[in-house]
Amino acid sequence: MLSKQKTKNRKGIEDAEIGDSYTFVGLDADSKLILAHHVGQRTALHTDAFVEKLDRATGGRFQLTTDGFNAYPDAIAYHLGTRTDYATLVKEFGTESEEERRYSPPRIIAATKTVIHGEPDEARICTSYVERVNLDVRMKCRRFTRLTNAFSKVWRNHRAAVALTVAHYNLCTMHRTIRMTPATKAGLVNRPWSVGDLLAA
């Protein structure tokens, strides 16, 4: 959230720089590397900007899974369509009380896999890895903490904080599954970086 959504609503402010923000994340399931991210809003325009970044960050043919947000299929078809095997995974959540919803995510009661184009391997239609990374980012970046006053006040600062968090995750964070940093696994660097390395880059 940038500034305060409640203030924006109360004062009738029409300013795209105030209100909710959304962070798109593209993750490689094998190396756990965050390939691309985009801080904006959950709209078709920002979805297209994110998928364009993902297009620039990847090469060759690969399998892609997203949630059911309706802006993804057109953006992916335009930027990545000829080289992706694309499916969606839509999760259905149970009904929780308002109090439960404030402090924890609702319970998943069903999940539906849908092939959009290409020939994705059904066993690899999964959003669990990126959901785990989303949790990591939320835990590492105070600005994502819910129900606090730690939200960002300025877009520029928020984008910078997210970029630094992503860079630290890719280059400095040892991943338990692969036993190295994602950037090392992907062959981008030959050793884990320290925070000093990151700040000096």
Residue ranges and their predicted role:
Residues 1-201:
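Residue-level recognition of single "structural anchor" positions
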